[in-house]
Amino acid sequence: MSYQLVIAEKPSVARSIAGVIGADKKQDGYMEGNGYLVSWCIGHLVSLADAGTYDERFKKWRYDDLPILPQQWQYIIPNDKKKQFDTLRSLMERPDVTGLVCATDAGREGELIFRFVYQMAGCKKPFQRLWISSMEDAAIKDGFAHLKPGTDYDNLYQSALCRAQADWLVGINATRLFSILYHKTLTVGRVQTPTLKILVDRETKISSFQKEKYHIVQIVAGGMEAASERIGNADDAKALKSACETAQAVCVSVTREEKTEQPPRLYDLTTLQREANRLFGFTAKQTLDYAQQLYEKKLLTYPRTDSQYLTDDMLPTAESLVSGLWPLLPFAAGLDLSPQFGRVLNSKKVSDHHAIVPTMEFVQKGLDGLAEGEKKLLSLVCCKLLCAVAAPHVYEAVTATFTCAGNTFTAKGKTILTPGWKELDRRFKASFKTDADDTAPEPARELPEITEGQTFDKVTAAVTEHFTAPPKSYTEDTLLSAMERAGADDLPEDAERQGLGTPATRASILEKLVQMGFVERRGKQLLPTKDGHNLACVLPEVLTSPQLTAQWETELTAIAKGQADPEGFMAGIAEMTRGLIANYSQISEDAQRLFQTERVVIGKCPRCGESVYEGKKNYYCGNRSCQFVMWKNDRFFEERGKAFIPKIAAALLKDGKAKVKGLRSMKTGKTYDGTVLLADTGGKYVNYRVEQRGKN
C-alpha cells in the first residue's frame, strides 16, 4: 500500500486534517490511516544558520569581517526540534510514501517552513499544495479534492526565500556594524528600523510643536448655536462678543444636502488589528493570536490575509452566514436587514485569501466556551460582516450661516434619514462597552426649521479659548495604518498599498521593537525610548526610509507573482549592504557616547570620596585609580541567602551599616534580621560582618 505524507505547520492543525481525511491511528510523531501519513512541523523546524556557522571568526563581531555575504546559504535545526525533523525525514524516505502534501499555512511563511524541511531532508518526491482559507471540515475536504501542484507555488517560495535572506543580510551586517561603531548592541532590521523612524519622526513633530492660542465667539439665536471663525486676538473676540449681544442676527443662507456613508469593507488582518486596538485595547499580536486560535477552532477563516472582499462564487456562503448570524447576535435583535451582497464580492481583489469572516461552524456553535478575548474578536468580525451588507447610512447635512455685528457665524446640524449600518455598529459598541475614541467628533445636532432672511433680536454670546493641537502620538491602530501606507499621510484610501512588512509580520515587528528597548507602551501609545530615538537618528536613510523599504516589499510581492527576478532583488540587497559597510567605518567620539548607559550613583566611596556607581555585576568607584569595588555575588551575601541589592549597598556607603531582613543562619539555616557592617580594610576585597542578631 502506498501513502501520501501530509505535513502541517503545527500538531493541532495536523490533528484537524487527520480527523477529516481518516488518518485516525496515532503513531510516534504522526498519524496514519486511509492512505495518509499526517505529521507536522513545530513552526520553523529549519532556519537560516547564524553567521558563526560559515566561519569561526564570524563568532566575534569585528568591523574588518564585514560585510558577511554567504555564497552558499546554510541551514540549522534547533536542538529542541531535531526529533520532529528526524521523524519527518524518515517518513519522507519510506519507500511506501510516493508523494507529499504541503499543508502548512497557506501563505508566504507557511510555504517557507515546508520548503526548508523538504530541502534539508533531501527529498525529491513530488508534492502537492493544500490551499484553504478555513479549517472547517468541509473546507479541508474540498481542499484535498482540489490539491494543486506544488510547483504552482515556486514563485511564492522564491519570494519567501528572498525575504528571509534579505532580512538576514541587513540584520546581521547592519546590526554588527552599528553595534561595533557605538559600542552597544543595536539591533537593526529591514522593516523594524523604518517603523521605528516613523515613531521617532512623529514624536519629533510633537516635541517641536508650538501651540498657538485662538478664540471663537459663539452666539445663540433662536435656540441655535453658531460659531465664528478663529480669532487670534482676545480683545477682538471680547469686542465682537459685546457687539453681538446688542445686535440682530440674520440668517443669510441655509444649505441642505443629503449625504450617504457606505457600509464598511470586511476585515483584512491589518484593519482587524487596528479596530481591535481602538475598541478593546488589544495589541496587534494579541489580535493575531486570538484570530489564529479561532481559525484553528474552525470558527474563523484564515486571518493572515490582505483582502477585504469575498470571491464572487462565495455568494451562497455569505447569504448563509448572514441569515445564520442575524438571530444569533443580541446587538442585532429587532433590526430589519435587507442584505446587499454586491459590495463584499469582488474576485479581482482577492489574491491568496479572501477577507476574514466567521465560519458556518460558528453559526452552529456560537460563543459558548470561548475566552473573553476570543469572544470579543469573533463578535467584532461578525458585526463587520453584518455592517458590510447592511443598508447605507443616509443623513441630511444642514449648514446655516448668520451675520451678526458685521461678522459671519456658522451653525451645523444633521438629520438622520436612514440609520443603516451605523445603528448596528452603535449597538455592538454599546454591548461590549468598548474603549471611548478620543478622536471621534461630537455628533451634530438637528437644527430647528429656519429660513433665509429670518432675523433674531435676542442674541447671547460667549468667548471660548482654544489652542492649536500637535499631532497625536501613535497607537498600534494608527501605527499599523502608517506601516500599511509606508508612513505617507496623504495617500487616498484606494491607493495601491506599498507598506512596511505584511499583515502577517507587522505584529511581530512591533513586539520586537518593544523587546529590544527601542519602543515602550504607555497606555495605548507607542513611544520611542531614548535609545530608539538616537538609533533612528544616526542610521542612514537607506535603512530608515519607509518608502524605500516599502519598495522592497512591493518587489517581493512581484516575485511571488512571477513578475520580478529573485536574483536581481538579492543582488540589490547585497550591493546596498556593501555600500553601507564602505560608507560607515568610523564615527566621532561624541557620537560614540550617544548610547552610553546612564550610570546610577549609589553613594560616595569610603576610600576616596568619589561617586560609586552600580554596574552589571558590582558597585564600583568612578575614580579609576581607586580600587574600591563591592561585588553583587559576594560570598558573604550568597551564603546568607540575600541578594546584594542597591538599597543595601547605598546604606553601607552612607552609614557603614545596613539593616537587612531575612538573613539565613549558616549554623541553623533559620532566618533572622540583622545589621550588616561594611568592614573595608583598603585591600583588594571588601569585607562584611553581622553586628547583631534578633530571632524572628
PLM-predicted stretches and their roles:
Residues 2-5, 92, 151, 175, ...:
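Basic, low-complexity terminal or inter-domain segments flanking catalytic cores
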Residues 11-18, 35-38, 42, 78-89, ...:
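Amphipathic alpha-helical transducer elements in NTP-driven molecular machines
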Residues 8-9, 40-42, 104, 170, ...:
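Flexible glycine-/small-residue-rich
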Residues 2-5, 103-106, 183-185, 256-265, ...:
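Conserved short loop/turn motifs at secondary-structure junctions
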Residues 1-164, 168, 470:
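Intrinsically disordered, low-complexity regulatory segments
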Residues 234-267, 273:
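Metal- or metallocofactor-binding catalytic centers and their adjacent structured scaffolds
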Residues 73, 95, 137-221, 256-260:
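C-terminal or mid-to-C-terminal helical accessory/interaction module adjacent to the motor/catalytic core
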